[in-house]
Amino acid sequence: MAFLALGINHKTASVDVRERVAFTPEQLVEALQQLCHLTESREAAILSTCNRSELYIEHEHLGADSILAWLANYHHLSLEELRASAYVHEDDAAVRHMMRVASGLDSLVLGEPQILGQMKSAYAVAREAGTVGPLLGRLFQATFSAAKQVRTDTAIGENPVSVAFAAVSLAKQIFSDLQRSQALLIGAGETITLVARHLHDLGVKRIVVANRTLERASMLAAEFGAHAVLLSDIPAELVNSDIVISSTASQLPILGKGAVESALKLRKHKPIFMVDIAVPRDIEPEVGELDDVYLYSVDDLHEVVAENLKSRQGAALAAEQLVSVGAEDFMSRLRELAAVDVLRAYRQQSERLRDEELSKAQRMLANGSNAEDVLIQLARGLTNKLLHAPSVQLKKLSAEGRVDALAMAQELFALGEGSTDKTPQ
């Protein structure tokens, strides 16, 4: 039984690398099943967001190199390139890492709540793929509990700091009066929902939500009094859009340089502010080369985020302590579980010996033997049988000079110093 947490994130890899290592929702089930089959991982889950791609694995004797090799091969990367950005946590450190991630302590935005939902989705997908068993399942449940306690017992989530908030904060710096601005939001997921909420609260003049399906776009638009369109309508909407914020799960760019260039001409080169939160990117990087376009990626949000984190630093210290306690408690309980099978086997063996001696005593009583003599023989016989195997093994270990095993046996049987009966025979 061992755990591995392996991956890359915004601190170790550029957005170029992250988008190449990202998994689409459609890939996850097949990727998990392939991972377990080819690497002999016993249990596995994958967390893939715009800021990180991580693999959580339970195994018996598996090196991180085989997992890295699988990940590099799956995404058609060189092993050296991936290894340069990857990190590996094992056992206790892996447990603590998972709990830190779920609590928002390892996020670009300290304490952001979205990561817990993403972690729960990773668990649900792994269950669907059939790659989560009892051990990784227990770890996920302990991780969710630790993250919930961090939210409940600290102030780490009190202030509205998130990637979505950072994107809107940048927009406020570009446009002094957002109430005169029009925004085009591409996507309809959790991040875009947060962006829409922030823009709506700031009184943005008009919000348009573009999505692959009109139904999902309409649901989000209705919540904030916005307009819903399809992705194919984006070129027409660009002409009136001062702010464009995109976050989809598309594997290919949705917005190219040509479409933006055409929109700028019709806008008479009135500036467009763009934030691409997606990984892989939704907006071609070449769009940033255009005059009158302010294009920011996820990595560009670091500075804005840093300015909004000061109020959370104190809470983070308390959260780290809670996570450490949670990780230690989980590993302690897991190690206790490792003894369950041994204890069960020992109990079954003891009960078999008991039943044998009891049957013998019952036969003696049926044959008219003295009850007191039968009880004495029952007690002696049971004691001898229970002690036989341990006695043989202890003598063998002693002959081999295994002082450590003898000391362990003394602790196992709760034999303190002076507990030996020294009554003369």
Curated annotation (Swiss-Prot):
Pathway(s) where this gene product acts: Porphyrin-containing compound metabolism; protoporphyrin-IX biosynthesis; 5-aminolevulinate from L-glutamyl-tRNA(Glu): step 1/2
Residues binding NADP(+), per UniProt: 187-192
Residues binding substrate: 49-52, 107, 112-114, 118
Alphabetical list of InterPro entries matching this protein: 4pyrrol_synth_GluRdtase, 4pyrrol_synth_GluRdtase_dimer, 4pyrrol_synth_GluRdtase_N, GluRdtase_CS, GluRdtase_dimer_dom_sf, GluRdtase_N_sf, NAD(P)-bd_dom_sf, Shikm_DH/Glu-tRNA_Rdtase
NADP among keywords: yes
Record: active site: 50 (nucleophile)
EC number: 1.2.1.70
Transmembrane segments: none
Molecular-function annotations in GO: glutamyl-tRNA reductase activity; NADP binding
Catalysed conversion reaction: (S)-4-amino-5-oxopentanoate + tRNA(Glu) + NADP(+) = L-glutamyl-tRNA(Glu) + NADPH + H(+)
Site positions (Important for activity): 97
GO biological processes: protoporphyrinogen IX biosynthetic process from glutamate
Domain of life: Bacteria
Keywords, alphabetical: NADP, Oxidoreductase, Porphyrin biosynthesis
Function: Catalyzes the NADPH-dependent reduction of glutamyl-tRNA(Glu) to glutamate 1-semialdehyde (GSA).
PANTHER family for the chain: GLUTAMYL-TRNA REDUCTASE
Additional information: During catalysis, the active site Cys acts as a nucleophile attacking the alpha-carbonyl group of tRNA-bound glutamate with the formation of a thioester intermediate between enzyme and glutamate, and the concomitant release of tRNA(Glu). The thioester intermediate is finally reduced by direct hydride transfer from NADPH, to form the product GSA.
Family note: Belongs to the glutamyl-tRNA reductase family.
NCBIfam families: hemA
Assembly: Homodimer.
UniProt domain comment: Possesses an unusual extended V-shaped dimeric structure with each monomer consisting of three distinct domains arranged along a curved 'spinal' alpha-helix. The N-terminal catalytic domain specifically recognizes the glutamate moiety of the substrate. The second domain is the NADPH-binding domain, and the third C-terminal domain is responsible for dimerization.
Name of the protein: Glutamyl-tRNA reductase
Species the sequence originates in: Pseudomonas savastanoi pv. phaseolicola (strain 1448A / Race 6) (Pseudomonas syringae pv. phaseolicola (strain 1448A / Race 6))
Lineage: Bacteria, Pseudomonadati, Pseudomonadota, Gammaproteobacteria, Pseudomonadales
